[in-house]
């Protein structure tokens, strides 16, 4: 199954191969990038933002996750401006997750 068809099936709610090579690789990439992001706590904002831009579909300005942030893929997550997530945020993005502007997310 082509990558485009696989993602279309995911987003439409149809059955798809969750263990396809692409999805396994994207999960691994998400693990590495979230680990990197979580380990940069206290580093310059630009360093942390660059990691989020590699991981997530789209982010606005002033986006912050307290450690430990986790997601399944990252490519289905869009976040607006002025976002804060408290510790241990987990986003399972087998489908689109869209968060608007001026959002505080906490336990």
Predicted regions and their residues:
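A structural motif detector for beta-strand N-caps
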Residues: 61-71, 77, 81-89, 97, ...
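Terminal amphipathic alpha-helical/low-complexity segments used for targeting or macromolecular assembly
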Residues: 1-62
């Amino acid at each position: 199954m082509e990558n485009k068809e696989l993602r279309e099936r995911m987003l439409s709610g149809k059955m798809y191969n969750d263990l396809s090579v692409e999805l396994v690789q994207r999960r691994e990439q998400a693990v590495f990038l979230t680990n990197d992001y979580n380990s940069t706590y206290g580093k310059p904002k630009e360093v942390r933002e660059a990691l989020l831009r590699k991981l997530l579909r789209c982010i606005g300005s002033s986006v912050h996750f307290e450690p430990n942030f986790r997601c399944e893929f990252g490519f289905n997550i869009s976040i607006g401006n002025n976002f804060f997530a408290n510790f241990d945020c987990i986003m399972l993005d087998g489908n689109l997750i869209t968060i608007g502007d001026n959002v505080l997310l906490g336990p």
